Amino acid sequence: MRTIFHIDVNSAFLSWEAAKRLKSGDSFDLRTVPSAVAGSEKDRHGIILAKSFPAKKFNIKTGEPVRSALEKCPELILVKPDFGTYRWYSNKMFGLLCDFSDKIERYSIDECFLDYTGMESIYGEAEDGARLISQRIKDELGFTVNIGIGENKLLAKMAGELE
C-alpha cells in the first residue's frame, strides 16, 4: 500500500510575507492580526489573495474585493503581493521536501504531493514523518503547513482539508 502526503502551506502568500518580514528583523507578525495580501484597487486588481486567520473571523474570503473586505474589517492591514518572494519560499520548501522523498509532484506554488512509501524505516511511521516535515518547515523557513496522509492523492488531499 502506498503512503501519500498532501502538503499545503497555510495562507501561503500571507505566511511567506510574514516570514520574510520577520527574517529581515521586523518584530510584528502579520499572521497575528487581521491582514491580507491584496492587489491594488487603483489598478483594478483589488481582490484578497490570502488572509490571516484573524481576518477569517471577519468572514473575509479569498477572491473577495478589497472594498468589501474593508467594510467588514476597517482595521484590515493590506500588503501588496510580492511574487518573487513567494517563488523563493516555494522553491525552498520543495528543496527541503526533497530530503524526504524524490517522488514529489508540485500541485501549485504552495501545494504538493509527496510519496512517503518506503520511508518509514528512515523517518518513522507516516504521522511521525509528517510531524518532522512540518517542524522542519516551521523551524527553517518560518511558516506552517497542513499535511494530509492517504493511500492516494485524493484521500491525502481530503485528509489535509479536515479540521
What are these regions (language model features)?
Residues M1-E163:
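Gly/Gly-Pro- and Ser/Thr-rich, intrinsically disordered tail segments characteristic of DNA damage-repair
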